[in-house]
């Protein structure tokens, strides 16, 4: 008996050319799944697929535009033609305009972010779900990528936040629609994760991002991948419609670096009492 949790299963990872997507695809392969990789960058996809193949896994790379229905339909059809089934999907593509106050955002840039996040996730599930319903074993698991920004909001990121809130809503409805048909749908909501964006921002930005979490550090793509893998495995068979933060406690609330003793603040200068 094989003890790999995804042995004999087929996983589809959208946005698999780099970062969290590539790391998650590699995690699926290491857990025994055949993996289908999707993204716009064909060369980067091929490199990830080659790495999986060299480590003894099975990978298929399919260049895909998640906002185009025909492209997403082709992705799922290629998956079924190659492997004959689809058991797990991670819809991870994301986009958004540069940070700016809401009134300063270009409408076309706003639309682009919404299309990638909401339309891309919708199209992914639209074609993934029928394929999963056809599995002899019945059903499958879908994980969609949101963000803590979709849970609590972030200033100057209106398009990104709106997109992530929309993904959470789509996930909730899909989970309800298919809960009694063997398909589970959940959301992961990462906080600050060390990917190429945060690496490019430099050490100071990384330090500040870490300090924004109660755990006082940033997360890794591997930590996100582990949660996605669990949500797609039999170990989470009673979990659907959930939003799982992966944020070091950031969405739970604020934790000041140093807490004052009760009443201490009132004893400080300027609060009605003076020191002798």
Q: Would you name each region that the model predicts?
A:
Residues 187, 203-239, 246-248, 271-276:
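C-terminal helical subdomain
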Residues 147:
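Residue(s) in the substrate-gating loop at a strand-loop-helix junction
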Residues 104-111, 115, 203, 267-268:
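Short, well-ordered secondary-structure patches that form non-catalytic structural/interaction elements
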